[in-house]
């Protein structure tokens, strides 16, 4: 199950009438890119306005875009145009290099309806924001702060209930081998804890909600004072400065929210 959130786009209401499809998860070579092209063409014969989302953390091997797959990373839109409209890059690749964002965005064609989203999957690891077990609360919450600051129009998470298969719903929950603890799992079967069949939310998904609400505060502030002022507020309060520089407790976030309330309540 994918969890995608359209929290930045001023035209997000239009997505209610569109279909978004992902044809291939993290393609690595030109053969896999050709699969995306073929599936995209086939989908358009049935749904002409479908929007194709492609996740990737490197450029395609075997291409002539650049000397290495890392250098080709920013050039991916040139390979997949017009077969992808939403280019979704891994935060792991960006690391702490926020300058890479400009390189990625520079290759996009907004006039063709192209967008840039980000995602986390396995990486990045501590101290950068992610949703693994064992990370602090603000580290979970900062995934949203990071995505907003970088300027994408959406965010994708690869899975929300991807624990190991079990024969009965009440079986002990086991995370998938080879993945960081909690990766791809944000809620649990209710039967594990009681007779209820209602899913049980994790603390992490509650923190994700808090991060999404923080985005709404920042968007409100932006609507009144402009995005640059909202970015300055995020940094001035110490809530979030970068992927390895953010608040370790919720005090600065409360200050940020309080300032938004004070200046926007009238």
Regions found by a protein language model. Name each.
Residues 62, 110-142, 159:
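Active-site clefts of carbohydrate-active enzymes
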Residues 8-9, 22-23, 89, 118, ...:
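Conserved beta-strand positions
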Residues 76-124:
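Glycoside hydrolase catalytic-domain groove-lining segments
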Residues 38, 63-77, 94-108, 139-142:
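Alpha-helical scaffolding within the catalytic cores
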Residues 2-71, 75-76, 152-153, 168-266:
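Catalytic domains of carbohydrate-active enzymes that cleave complex glycans
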Residues 139, 151-163:
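Glycine-rich, aromatic-lined ligand/substrate-binding cores of catalytic
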Residues 11-13, 59, 94, 123-124, ...:
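Short, solvent-exposed loop/turn segments at secondary-structure junctions
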